[in-house]
């Protein structure tokens, strides 16, 4: 019907479209009551329509007796086609001209068909006035109403004839197509068919309850009522329910018949109805009430903004189910995607793989791609992991999003292609053995069409930004934190989780419930639901808030207690799963960030540190009457590039000029406190310069050496040439002679990079230059590692991560030749991007 309009019980006010004349429309009745309710007044044409309907059954009886069943079916099929074309083409043309030019109204006005004096001179006017008077109550004065209303009342008679004939001839054709053996009708198909028919009846009744006669008979093509478009009842669960789910009865009857010819006729009739909707009704609705197109939605605006701000951005390649959109001739990934499909098809037709092999390949591919994409989105939602990965390697935020678009689209295309090839192989096997069930194949193709339609509607509603989960990657582009309720999302919260697998189950139907296809369909459905519940919904709550969007279908179903109970049960299960997942994720987070932030080491290292501190006294007793202390160490933390000085003292009887002090990571030394079993790797210092005359680096660290009659003492300073540039818990060990025998062990202490909160790029640059200069690793304002072999590119990367909270890969540092200006600018840009994402 033309519009979804609901009015309150107050007096209705209407106005003509062009002249603006206001009036109160009279009470009218629906088609069934007008024709068949004996208590309601009947017009001449209504009596003729009723007799015509009854004549169809008489004609059917004689056709069967005279010409046989097959000829009777053919005649009623021809009749149905005629009346269906009269409906969609005939009424469509009339309404088209009425919508654009008000042709019927102008004709009536020009010929004065409803003027009182015309009835005496014009037999057409006389008949029309007689028809309206015989139809309406006695107090109805047609001359006091505008021509628009009277035209509409006559138009209703024309509609009643066509619609009732269309319905009657179709029902008779279906009846003639039923199997002669009644017992064959007792099966699950009949049960489903009856359920679909009952649902169809409810749709029609509820639709009329909402829209009343005015919209049922396309009243707004003639005049307008002071009422607004509404979405209530059946209009809450489906777009254009009279043309979509309002035809489920067609498919229910086809299912009961089990005749694919009936199904094809039903599909054809339904298809013509959609053409009527597309070319007649929808354009009129848009002109009259405004467009409901989501083209100006936030998601569409974001797509435009991305393209506007990034000159190298182009819309991603998308498979619509049949063709490709946005193919770019200069984008290699597009060629790679299309080539993959061509290779798969070529391999299928040349190698002819077995059904089992295709099943296993499809199953593994679906599982692998689902796990990969789900893991990426989960990590991206919690840590912005995917964006960080590309940012630290020198790429932009938009580039990382483009790579995700390719990865996601490629995984969809490959899995769907493999499923298609597997289904094709199954169909070929069935055709070779038992033969295909044509009805199953057609119903399966219809489900595939529903999935394609769902995908198109989803993309139309949320644009590329929503289709590719842009709110996981580009939250800084979101201007309005509000979920869309346009298009298909008015009716379903997650259409891809329900209708998005319709085609998958269509493959099950086409293959006559093949075990492999059932398994794949279950896999597709379960993975979709898990993804929506555990990844998508938590992220949506995080980005758009906890306010839930209630879809039309959900609103309708939640009014029923059983559905409400099931919904609560699923929500509880999902919340428990999310708590366990986030608990695991938090543990992994604590481990991943324990690499050296100020006071932010892992609990394992801190506990080790406290335990080791408690046994320092017992460690020093390894050498009695000795001293081994770190000087001026605040909070037991050394911030690089500061140096560390340790003072020592030993009895002269225990001293040897070959003694030396090594620096070790506590976690690597093990539990042996008397013998060091790992090498110092150059992080050591002599205590007496005479002991190692040729090791200048390891003797220049000696700042004091005193040798008395009873004791020997000294001070050693570990600077950037000897310290580790790996944050952690460390200790000094004093070794006897040129061995690894331990005489003294210092208190454990922490080596860490400093932390900075600099926002300006120039401040970041100054801090980096100051640090590199202090450790002799800068030349011409570039990182230069030759003067300090311990501060490698990895160490530089860790310094940037720990000091500024930004990750840069060593590959990027090398790629820009360690240029401090470029690196500082990159750090600044990444900080801005990540801050905007938060």
Curated annotation (Swiss-Prot):
Question: What top-level branch of life does the organism fall under?
Answer: Eukaryota
Topological domain ranges for the Lumenal compartment: 1-48, 95-157, 206-236, 283-328, 378-403, 457-517
Q: Does the keyword Transferase apply?
A: yes
* Membrane-crossing segments per the record: 49-69, 74-94, 158-178, 185-205, 237-257, 262-282, 329-349, 357-377, 404-424, 436-456, 518-538
> Which keywords, in A-to-Z order, does the entry hold?
Endoplasmic reticulum, Lipid biosynthesis, Lipid metabolism, Membrane, Methyltransferase, Phospholipid biosynthesis, Phospholipid metabolism, S-adenosyl-L-methionine, Transferase, Transmembrane, Transmembrane helix
Q: What does the record give as its pathway? A: Phospholipid metabolism; phosphatidylcholine biosynthesis
Entry's InterPro entries?
Phopholipid_MeTrfase, Phosphatid-EA_MeTrfase_fun
Show the catalytic activity.
a 1,2-diacyl-sn-glycero-3-phosphoethanolamine + S-adenosyl-L-methionine = a 1,2-diacyl-sn-glycero-3-phospho-N-methylethanolamine + S-adenosyl-L-homocysteine + H(+)
In the UniProt record, which is one GO cellular component term? Answer: endoplasmic reticulum membrane
The segments annotated as topological domain Cytoplasmic are 70-73, 179-184, 258-261, 350-356, 425-435, 539-838
Q: Please give the positions of the paired cysteines in each disulfide bond.
A: none
- Known Gene3D superfamilies for this protein? 1.20.120.1630, 2.60.40.2840
- Function recorded in the entry: Catalyzes the first step of the methylation pathway of phosphatidylcholine biosynthesis, the SAM-dependent methylation of phosphatidylethanolamine (PE) to phosphatidylmonomethylethanolamine (PMME).
**What HAMAP family does the database record attribute to this sequence?**
PEMT (MF_03217)
State the name under which the record lists this protein.
Phosphatidylethanolamine N-methyltransferase 1
Q: Which gene encodes it?
A: CHO2-1
């Amino acid at each position: 019907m033309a519009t979804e309009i609901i009015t309150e019980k107050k007096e209705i006010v209407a106005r003509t479209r062009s002249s603006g004349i206001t009036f109160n429309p009279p009470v009218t009745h629906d088609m069934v009551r007008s024709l068949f309710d004996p208590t309601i007044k009947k017009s001449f044409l209504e009596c003729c329509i009723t007799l015509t309907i009854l004549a169809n059954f008489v004609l059917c009886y004689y056709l069967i007796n005279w010409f046989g069943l097959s000829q009777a079916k053919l005649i009623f099929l021809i009749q149905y086609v005629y009346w269906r074309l009269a409906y969609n083409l005939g009424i469509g043309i009339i309404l088209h001209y009425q919508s654009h030019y008000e042709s019927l109204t102008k004709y009536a006005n020009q010929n004065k068909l409803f003027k009182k004096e015309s009835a005496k001179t014009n037999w057409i006017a006389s008949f029309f006035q007689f028809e309206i008077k015989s139809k309406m109550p006695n107090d109805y004065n047609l001359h006091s109403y505008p021509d628009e209303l009277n035209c509409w009342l006559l138009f209703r008679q024309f509609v009643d004839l066509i619609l009732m004939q269309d319905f009657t001839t179709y029902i008779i054709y279906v009846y003639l197509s039923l199997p002669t053996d009644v017992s064959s009708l007792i099966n699950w198909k009949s049960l489903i068919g009856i359920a679909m028919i009952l649902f169809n009846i409810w749709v029609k009744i509820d639709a009329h309850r909402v829209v009343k006669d005015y919209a049922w008979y396309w009243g707004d093509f003639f005049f307008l009522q002071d009422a607004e478009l509404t979405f209530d009842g059946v209009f809450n669960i489906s777009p254009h329910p009279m043309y979509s789910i309002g035809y489920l009865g067609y498919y229910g009857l086809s299912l009961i018949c089990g005749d694919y010819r009936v199904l094809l006729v039903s599909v054809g009739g339904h298809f013509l109805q959609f053409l009527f909707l597309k070319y007649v009704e929808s354009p009129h609705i848009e002109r009259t009430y405004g467009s409901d197109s989501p083209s100006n939605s936030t998601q569409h605006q974001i797509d435009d903004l991305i393209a506007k701000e990034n000159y190298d951005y182009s819309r991603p390649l998308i498979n619509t189910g049949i063709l490709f959109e946005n193919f770019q001739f200069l984008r290699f990934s597009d060629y790679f995607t299309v080539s993959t499909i061509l290779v798969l098809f070529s391999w299928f037709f040349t190698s002819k793989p077995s059904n089992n092999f295709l099943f296993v390949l499809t199953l593994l591919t679906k599982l692998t791609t689902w796990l990969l994409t789900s893991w990426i989105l989960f990590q991206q939602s919690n840590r912005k992991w995917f964006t960080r990965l590309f940012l630290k390697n020198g790429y932009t935020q938009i580039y990382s999003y483009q790579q995700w678009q390719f990865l996601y689209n490629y995984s969809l295309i490959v899995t769907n292609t493999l499923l298609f090839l597997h289904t094709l192989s199954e169909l070929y096997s069935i055709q070779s053995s038992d033969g295909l069930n044509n009805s199953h194949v057609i119903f399966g193709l219809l489900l595939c069409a529903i999935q394609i339609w769902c995908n198109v509607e989803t993309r139309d509603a949320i644009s590329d930004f929503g289709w590719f989960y842009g709110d996981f990657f580009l939250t800084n582009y979101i201007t309005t934190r509000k979920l869309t309720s346009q298009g298909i999302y008015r009716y379903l919260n997650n259409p891809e989780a329900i209708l998005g697998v319709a085609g998958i189950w269509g493959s099950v139907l086409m293959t006559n419930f093949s075990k492999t296809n059932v398994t794949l369909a279950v896999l597709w459905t379960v993975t979709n639901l898990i993804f929506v519940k555990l990844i998508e919904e938590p992220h949506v709550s995080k980005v758009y808030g906890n306010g839930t969007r209630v879809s039309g279908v959900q609103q309708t179903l939640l009014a029923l207690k059983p559905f409400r109970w099931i919904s609560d049960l699923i929500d509880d299960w999902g919340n428990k799963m999310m708590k366990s997942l986030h608990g695991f994720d938090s543990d992994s987070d604590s481990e991943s960030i324990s690499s050296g932030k100020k006071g932010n080491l892992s609990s394992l290292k801190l506990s080790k540190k406290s335990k080791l501190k408690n046994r320092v006294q017992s460690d020093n007793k390894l050498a009695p009457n000795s001293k081994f202390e770190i000087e001026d160490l605040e909070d037991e933390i050394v911030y690089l590039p500061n140096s560390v000085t340790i003072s020592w003292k030993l009895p002269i009887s225990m001293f040897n000029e070959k003694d030396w002090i090594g620096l070790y990571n506590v976690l690597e030394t093990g539990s042996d406190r008397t013998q060091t079993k790992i090498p110092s790797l150059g992080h050591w210092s002599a205590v007496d310069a005479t002991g190692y005359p040729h090791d200048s680096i390891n003797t220049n660290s000696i700042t004091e050496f005193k040798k008395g009659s009873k004791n020997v003492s000294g001070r050693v300073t570990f600077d950037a040439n000897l310290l580790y540039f790996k944050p952690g818990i460390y200790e000094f060990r004093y070794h006897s002679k040129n061995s690894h025998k331990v005489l003294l062990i210092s208190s454990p202490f922490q080596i860490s990079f400093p932390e900075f909160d600099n926002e300006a790029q120039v401040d970041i640059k100054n801090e980096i230059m100051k640090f590199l200069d202090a450790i002799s690793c800068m030349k011409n304002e570039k990182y230069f590692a030759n003067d300090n072999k311990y501060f490698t590119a990895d160490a530089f990367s860790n310094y940037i991560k720990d000091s500024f909270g930004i990750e840069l890969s060593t590959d990027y540092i090398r790629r820009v030749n360690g240029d401090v200006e470029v690196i500082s600018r990159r750090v600044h840009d990444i900080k801005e991007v990540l801050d905007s994402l938060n």
